[in-house]
Swiss-Prot record:
It comes from the Eukaryota. Its main location: membrane. Residues 616-627, 676-702, 776-788, 851-915 are cytoplasmic. This is Metabotropic glutamate receptor 7. SUPFAM superfamilies: Periplasmic binding protein-like I. The modification Phosphoserine is found at S900. Glycans are attached at N98, N458, N486, N572. One of its GO terms (molecular function) is calmodulin binding. GO terms for biological process: adenylate cyclase-inhibiting G protein-coupled glutamate receptor signaling pathway; adult behavior; associative learning; axon development; behavioral fear response; chemical synaptic transmission; conditioned taste aversion; G protein-coupled glutamate receptor signaling pathway. Pfam families: 7tm_3, ANF_receptor, NCD3G.
Amino acid sequence: MVQLGKLLRVLTLMKFPCCVLEVLLCVLAAAARGQEMYAPHSIRIEGDVTLGGLFPVHAKGPSGVPCGDIKRENGIHRLEAMLYALDQINSDPNLLPNVTLGARILDTCSRDTYALEQSLTFVQALIQKDTSDVRCTNGEPPVFVKPEKVVGVIGASGSSVSIMVANILRLFQIPQISYASTAPELSDDRRYDFFSRVVPPDSFQAQAMVDIVKALGWNYVSTLASEGSYGEKGVESFTQISKEAGGLCIAQSVRIPQERKDRTIDFDRIIKQLLDTPNSRAVVIFANDEDIKQILAAAKRADQVGHFLWVGSDSWGSKINPLHQHEDIAEGAITIQPKRATVEGFDAYFTSRTLENNRRNVWFAEYWEENFNCKLTISGSKKEDTDRKCTGQERIGKDSNYEQEGKVQFVIDAVYAMAHALHHMNKDLCADYRGVCPEMEQAGGKKLLKYIRHVNFNGSAGTPVMFNKNGDAPGRYDIFQYQTTNTTNPGYRLIGQWTDELQLNIEDMQWGKGVREIPSSVCTLPCKPGQRKKTQKGTPCCWTCEPCDGYQYQFDEMTCQHCPYDQRPNENRTGCQNIPIIKLEWHSPWAVIPVFLAMLGIIATIFVMATFIRYNDTPIVRASGRELSYVLLTGIFLCYIITFLMIAKPDVAVCSFRRVFLGLGMCISYAALLTKTNRIYRIFEQGKKSVTAPRLISPTSQLAITSSLISVQLLGVFIWFGVDPPNIIIDYDEHKTMNPEQARGVLKCDITDLQIICSLGYSILLMVTCTVYAIKTRGVPENFNEAKPIGFTMYTTCIVWLAFIPIFFGTAQSAEKLYIQTTTLTISMNLSASVALGMLYMPKVYIIIFHPELNVQKRKRSFKAVVTAATMSSRLSHKPSDRPNGEAKTELCENVDPNSPAAKKKYVSYNNLVI
């Protein structure tokens, strides 16, 4: 019979003429009759309209034998569900009234080739021709029972079986509705146009499984598939959807071969292969019951309890049988199953079945023996010997365990879908006819298929039963997790559902040993905050983590970006934050010293100025040149004041005052000193040439010259104001160190180092010029005592500013630039002012206060005395002296008496002329 089926399948697919098929019917009839003599192989129920049924009543047989042991749940439960549905429909006056549904139910033995041979029974009536002229080899006409016409088929179960059967049913336009086949390829309406199913395809299931895996944070999984259409196509769909979704990688795809010599060794090898990628703990399984059981057993033998995270397809569902004796290795397994509900009416129906009231089921006696582990004395077919005999009084659910099989609901829905289609077809074609009218009998499968695709009713679970254009049912799944710890009822727990989108109650989930924390199945642990992923070529789920360095932050998982100019990375480098703004604070050590010196200087300056004002008409004050002394003291005071402006918090007003007073104090001081030294120099130079007094040596002239020199500084400042108005800035370059944590923005006036030097440059020029005059007047006699202190002042000041320049510019790249430069500048100005104050005025103040007896006018100087001193000084400069240290020079000066009659003879007296 097997070889006949294969031959007929080939001939049918090759579209041989019907006459050839007619000849083969003789052989088919004889073979069918012979098989009926061997054992009953189908269920026949008479009716006005006959539906075919394909169920895996038996498992695959060993090599050479088509069928094996009976399958109690997947086989008998589902078969009885069809019988139950037929009873309900035939007793329903509102569904197919006056029409009785019959059935021809066959066993597929869980094998696609055997199912194909069995399904030829459904097409016999369609290829039946006039056989009056047909003779068998012995000359006799063929003898066979006229087959009933099957208008539609319920089944099959396995996807590979449905694919094989669908190929032949479509040739004869027989609609087919499956209750369990989920292979995605069956959605191809061009190849399987007469195929429909009340369960969603694996493409929906695969999408749901991808959503589950991603919801749990897993991105590195392995797949395991039973060889065949269901397993391989399911994994193919899962892989394709995961690629489209992104963020999910397949570590390895393992296929379980169908033909195995040693099951134990093969499954142990599979577990070892899965362990080659230890980070891929999640295993997505599309496998049959037996393969699931064997893989769990192999994992237990490998002592991998708790390692693998199983994600099972609907072939696993909520079944208990595959987990028997392997509950510990299966704990935490997540399984998916088309949304279903227990059909209570079926439970009552099935538990009431006995050998007496269920004779229509030709396999029920065999089920009875298997279910109650007994042996029937007459019609039993149980192979193994047993001492216990079946009494026939056993009861299902009472004397044996019973739990409704998961696909019972879908079998019932499939039968009802066919019934509703026939009902609408009957109403349209047989409106005025009771029963099946000729039009309906001749309508054909294509018309029935149209009605099937348009059915819409509430199924046994209360959910709508409908089909899309490809014949697929909507995707509705329940999601379970197998839990044995921390529960009073170990078993499958409903943790979510999927209907186009995932709803998962993660808080209800637990894993091995009752752990609530979701285990990981990732190639590489997520990068820490502030690190970016650098993916490995070919494995986007595997990466190395590279820290964002410098002023970079983690922009996204793959990218580090630089923070804006005025920001730095936050602590974990996940974003940017503003760089702290700093300025020189009053309490800073860098500010305390300059402020202290400035305050001392200001006090001293005020004291000197007050003393000079108090003793304004005394000889020492008058001899110092009162007008320029007050100007010089004002400049010294401003040199001290600039310290406070340099440390004050920058704003527009402070910055404006900085520009004005930065060089003004020094300019006033050195302008006054320059005027003094220039006056001394001109007087003595003029004295060498003539007895006529030089011009512009009066106090008014001296003030005018000093004011002119100062006005140049002020003019430059006003031009600076016009070209570049004062403003405040935040300088981020100054303190932008290699370590962003130490980065600071410096709040300061918009004054560059070059502008500072330019502002001080004019004052430095005055200082240098004054120093030159101090050098030139170094030979002035001691009686003209203003020149020497000025000279010492200028020498010291030059040393101070020569030290200032390298310090100021040498710290341009230092992190402490703000502090060092400000402190250096203010201290330099304080020292310059202090040197001038100390050398020029402190000795005079000391005499005024502590030795007032010396503050008297000794003699009046006339310009004649100055000329005489200048002449003698000139002579001495050209005549070598035998006395060291200028003693001769002093002696000569002392011998000159400007009050002698000779001196007064030719010259006018300059009693009020002060040097």
